Amino acid sequence: MAKCLYCYKELNGNERDFHKACSKKIFGTLEAPILPYTHNNLNDLARQVIRSQTTLTGVQAKLSLDINKGSKNEPGRFTIVGLWGRYILKPQTERFGNLPELEDLTMHLAEIAKIRVVPHSLIRFEDGELCYITRRIDRTNEGGKLAMEDMCQLSEKLTEQKYKGSYEQIAKLVLRYSSAPKLDLVNFWEQVVFSWITGNADMHLKNFSLYSPQQEVYTLTPAYDMLSTALVMPEDTEELALTLNGKKRKLRKADFVMSMRASGLDEKVIENLFKKLLKVETKWMEFISLSFLPEEMQISYLSLIHISEPTRLQLI
């Protein structure tokens, strides 16, 4: 069964990789643009990235892309551009298998839990290999830049210090700089708890940001870089990238409650946050089984959330 790379639902007989409506949502056109590269020319791509300075920060390889519009009867084509590109592409990596499929699935799980995320999808190279693609929220349709600062910048730390800090410190920054501090505080803690449940130990200072979607308004960005690191790095004993209640390991619901309470959330809001995540477990199970992950990784993800004793969901 051929499935849509955006929504994972079955395609109609004449559709390839995307429903027209899904392509419109992520790319702005009814027909998805072509990604005219293959895994075999990634080395050439890497050299092009270095020459044109189109690389983006982060451990995982990232390329900055934009769309060259096609003619009336031809689809558009992605091309590597400078840092002003409206899309970010993450190809497969040699070290860890299936990271694009894993990141896209984890972003979908966040959406199922009603957590706002950046626009995202899977897309294929010309040779059929899957990549992860996301549309930048700090760029306008015309390529202009919106103000956006991550928590490394807001806490006046260097990029190499992105693992030096705590989630309580981020909560204080959200309260200080957000135009909707109480709402953004809840949204922030939802991202943190979700990351823990799904085994994401890489939500560091640069993976939370404030941006200005309209003049003189600063708000927490939708979630991005959501990835279950526990599935690809099972040897890592840390459960979070930053400290929570003074620790990164052996976390329990009480640790989250103490930190959220200290940041200013009341008990009812905290309990509702946990309930919101608990009630989507069945939907998560169903969606994982629809994903593009290999079956063995699907089973591992299901086990992380549901089967292992005790699961992180059971601990909340």
List where the protein language model places each region:
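TRNA-binding/sensing appendages of the translation machinery
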Residues: 1-39
